[in-house]
Amino acid sequence: MADDLEQQPQGWLSSWLPTWRPTSMSQLKNVEARILQCLQNKFLARYVSLPNQNKIWTVTVSPELRDRTPLVMVHGFGGGVGLWILNMDSLSTRRTLHTFDLLGFGRSSRPTFPRDPEGAEDEFVTSIETWRESMGIPSMILLGHSLGGFLATSYSIKYPDRVKHLILVDPWGFPLRPADPSQVRAPPTWVKAVASVLGRSNPLAVLRVAGPWGPGLVQRFRPDFKRKFADFFDDDTISEYIYHCNAQNPSGETAFKAMMESFGWARRPMLERIHLIRKDVPITMIYGANTWIDTSTGKKVKLQRPDSYVRDLEIEGASHHVYADQPHIFNAVVEEICDSVD
């Protein structure tokens, strides 16, 4: 309906009044283009069609470097390909890098997901596998941040032959929810705000309900994003990108809500299943030293996989968005991992 009104204004009043929810896929496309134009390496951006007619928005950097195993990066909740802008050039100097908007997020298709946690998770994982098949990628170094780390782990359980190394960056949804709240790290203000509305609506519904004030809410609750990307942008480009990614139809957001018990916890915690990943799949877990995520998970994964390669490390001066808080250190660590593969 909103898109129709934008394309075909009905009279002078419609053209005079601002659109209640000032967003569209074309606006998301435009702000993403401003971000991607910062790339120095050759890149290709396009839709990859899946057999079920869904489409996955995909960015491939350095497509000509085919001799090494490609790195595939999976963003977290509410994110998209643009948030990897501090990493894509550095991590594609010696190998091809692929990143994509998860099904239901960013510019990818936004279908209706199953409402149960297992069904929603499986829908995500199946879309990643059919994307891989459509891309013709035989195997990959798979990196996932936050929700992307949870889904990358689930994918590795089901398709271990396709994963040369699993890199989990501040992964969401691993530990069981403690019975004692005092054992939980204090989350940042924006997480508390999201958690306060979870019982009534989708996590980011407030952005859509706020209408023309939505973009301002992103800037108010996440001013840190502007600082993280200040070397590339001195305006509100990143805040606009985050807003337009999350002011659309909340398809992936609804699926995420089905998978979570509360914002910080999964209904199907990954620690209960990570032992199912084949023993020969190496895992590296990267945390921000100041993250609100439980960093003891790495040690617990080691205990569950005594006969497998598991490395966990913390990056000083970084919080949950490690890749943006300390991009140079993060890029060096990931590049070292990739070089260990080939």
UniProtKB/Swiss-Prot annotation:
It catalyses: N-hexadecanoyl-1,2-di-(9Z-octadecenoyl)-sn-glycero-3-phosphoethanolamine + H2O = N-hexadecanoyl-1-(9Z-octadecenoyl)-sn-glycero-3-phosphoethanolamine + (9Z)-octadecenoate + H(+); an N-acyl-1,2-diacyl-sn-glycero-3-phosphoethanolamine + H2O = N,1-diacyl-sn-glycero-3-phosphoethanolamine + a fatty acid + H(+); N-hexadecanoyl-1-(9Z-octadecenoyl)-sn-glycero-3-phosphoethanolamine + H2O = N-hexadecanoyl-sn-glycero-3-phosphoethanolamine + (9Z)-octadecenoate + H(+); N-octadecanoyl-1-(9Z-octadecenoyl)-sn-glycero-3-phosphoethanolamine + H2O = N-octadecanoyl-sn-glycero-3-phospho-ethanolamine + (9Z)-octadecenoate + H(+). Its EC number is 3.1.1.-, 3.-.-.-. One of its GO terms (cellular component) is lipid droplet. SUPFAM superfamilies: alpha/beta-Hydrolases. This is (Lyso)-N-acylphosphatidylethanolamine lipase. Belongs to the peptidase S33 family. ABHD4/ABHD5 subfamily. The lineage of its organism: Eukaryota, Metazoa, Chordata, Craniata, Vertebrata. It is an enzyme of class 3 (hydrolase). Lysophospholipase selective for N-acyl phosphatidylethanolamine (NAPE). Contributes to the biosynthesis of N-acyl ethanolamines, including the endocannabinoid anandamide by hydrolyzing the sn-1 and sn-2 acyl chains from N-acyl phosphatidylethanolamine (NAPE) generating glycerophospho-N-acyl ethanolamine (GP-NAE), an intermediate for N-acyl ethanolamine biosynthesis. Hydrolyzes substrates bearing saturated, monounsaturated, polyunsaturated N-acyl chains. Pfam families: Abhydrolase_1 (PF00561). One of its GO terms (molecular function) is lysophosphatidic acid acyltransferase activity. It comes from Bos taurus (Bovine). Keywords: Hydrolase, Lipid degradation, Lipid metabolism. Residues 70-324 form the AB hydrolase-1 domain. One of its GO terms (biological process) is phosphatidic acid biosynthetic process. InterPro entries: AB_hydrolase_1, AB_hydrolase_fold.
